[in-house]
């Protein structure tokens, strides 16, 4: 059969139609600068993205250093601002060093690929974020996917390995369900088998611990020489970017070998300045971390979720993707924006509303959330 005259992209129409039929079509929605609706969808957990100090920090960096870094940090993109922020972040999180990337995604790619490679083993939690999954695929290491939060399975995989090096990968706070990794137990297993533990604190920073220093700090593992932390600047810190924290030797290795660092333009100065200012606010106002969990507990009660949340995330399982999409749309029609997670982001049959608590939610906003969520969820569950 000749293929002459056929569009090489004709197959996209069939794929799009199939996704639409399965309720998995995604659309971009434009957000105004000041949203008219109540936001229970964003990851701005501490409410800092619009904080005056954070805005001033971004503007000052913009005026001082310009709109962009101008190149890779190995060429022209490394400024005093970047390095000062890395010291600030490492000090706050109890790490020896930090290296800033252009996003949390590239931080995970850079760290895991550079710290594994052919002839090594990666043991990754089944619910690890897509950036960690992609890093596993790019690493050329042997990858074992362990059942969610199953320490015994991790132990068995490490005990059976023939590779000299091994990395165990987990999120501290899992992004879809908001549950916590058993970090102390995982670390004990890693120590017993001589494995590195890599922990993504994207959803732990700013929320867990009495001062918002993350789950590693909370459980007494911050700064451990056999742990590498990754995190993002785009959630609790209300900015953009990512970072890898750990021993100084890790930082030096990443500068030499992490392709998502070497071949990427440095993080924009405005994002660095905003993140630095946000970190200062969090350091001065640690009560914001507790406020997030308090508001999450209220949202869980409103949504009929019986298990008390341990993070900013309240996951409301509805099952069918069309029901979840319809519920999210109904909430938005009544002035409340919520997250909607469907496959492949979550497993089939677990489509859900994802509610994200913020420290800055007011009593009036919580009253609106109660009114809307109670009505919409009653209909969705009927």
Curated annotation (Swiss-Prot):
Sites bearing N6-(pyridoxal phosphate)lysine, chain numbering: 235
- Positions binding pyridoxal 5'-phosphate in this chain are 104-105, 175, 200-203, 232-235
Q: Which reactions fall under this protein's catalytic activity?
A: 6-carboxyhexanoyl-[ACP] + L-alanine + H(+) = (8S)-8-amino-7-oxononanoate + holo-[ACP] + CO2
* Cofactor(s) required, per the database record: pyridoxal 5'-phosphate
Q: Kindly state which keywords UniProt assigns to this record, in alphabetical order.
A: Acyltransferase, Biotin biosynthesis, Pyridoxal phosphate, Transferase
Residue numbers binding substrate: 26, 129, 345
Q: In which pathway does it act?
A: Cofactor biosynthesis; biotin biosynthesis
Q: What is its EC number?
A: 2.3.1.47
Under the GO molecular function aspect, what terms does this record hold? 8-amino-7-oxononanoate synthase activity; pyridoxal phosphate binding
Query: How does it associate, per the subunit comment?
Result: Homodimer.
Q: What does this protein do?
A: Catalyzes the decarboxylative condensation of pimeloyl-[acyl-carrier protein] and L-alanine to produce 8-amino-7-oxononanoate (AON), [acyl-carrier protein], and carbon dioxide.
Family of this protein: Belongs to the class-II pyridoxal-phosphate-dependent aminotransferase family. BioF subfamily.
The protein in question is named 8-amino-7-oxononanoate synthase
What is the organism of origin for this protein? Mycolicibacterium smegmatis (strain ATCC 700084 / mc(2)155) (Mycobacterium smegmatis)
What gene does this protein come from?
Answer: bioF
């Amino acid at each position: 059969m000749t293929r002459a005259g056929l569009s090489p992209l004709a197959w996209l129409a069939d794929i799009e139609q199939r996704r639409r039929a399965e309720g998995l079509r995604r659309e971009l929605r434009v957000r105004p600068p000041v949203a008219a609706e109540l936001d229970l969808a964003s990851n701005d957990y501490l409410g800092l993205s619009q904080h005056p100090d954070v805005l001033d920090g971004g503007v000052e960096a913009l005026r001082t250093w310009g709109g962009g870094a101008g190149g890779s940090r190995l060429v022209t993109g490394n400024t005093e601002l970047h390095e000062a922020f890395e010291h600030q972040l490492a000090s706050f999180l109890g790490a020896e060093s930090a290296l800033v990337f252009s996003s949390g995604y590239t931080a995970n790619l850079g760290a895991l690929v550079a710290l594994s490679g052919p002839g090594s083993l990666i043991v990754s939690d089944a619910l690890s974020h897509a950036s960690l999954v992609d890093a596993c695929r790019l690493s050329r290491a042997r990858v074992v996917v362990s059942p969610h939060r199953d320490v015994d399975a991790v132990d068995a995989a490490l005990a059976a390995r023939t590779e000299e090096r091994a990395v165990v990968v987990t999120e501290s706070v899992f992004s879809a369900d908001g549950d916590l990794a058993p970090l102390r137990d995982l670390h004990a297993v890693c120590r017993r088998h001589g494995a590195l533990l890599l922990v993504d604190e994207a959803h732990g920073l700013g929320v867990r611990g009495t001062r918002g220093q993350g789950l590693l700090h909370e459980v007494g593992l911050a700064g451990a020489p056999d742990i590498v932390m990754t995190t993002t600047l785009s959630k609790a810190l209300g900015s953009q970017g990512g970072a890898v924290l750990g021993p100084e030797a890790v930082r030096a290795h990443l500068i030499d070998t992490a392709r998502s660092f070497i071949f990427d333009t440095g993080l924009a100065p405005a994002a660095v300045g905003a993140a630095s200012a946000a970190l200062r606010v969090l350091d001065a106002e640690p009560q914001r971390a507790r406020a997030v969990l308090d508001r999450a507990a209220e949202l869980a009660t409103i949504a009929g979720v019986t298990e008390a949340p341990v993070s900013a995330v309240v996951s409301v399982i509805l099952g069918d993707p069309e029901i979840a999409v319809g519920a999210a749309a109904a909430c938005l029609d009544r002035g409340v924006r919520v997250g909607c997670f469907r496959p492949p982001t979550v497993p089939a049959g677990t489509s859900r509303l994802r509610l994200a608590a913020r420290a800055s939610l007011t009593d009036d906003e919580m009253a609106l959330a109660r009114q809307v969520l109670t009505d919409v969820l009653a209909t969705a569950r009927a």
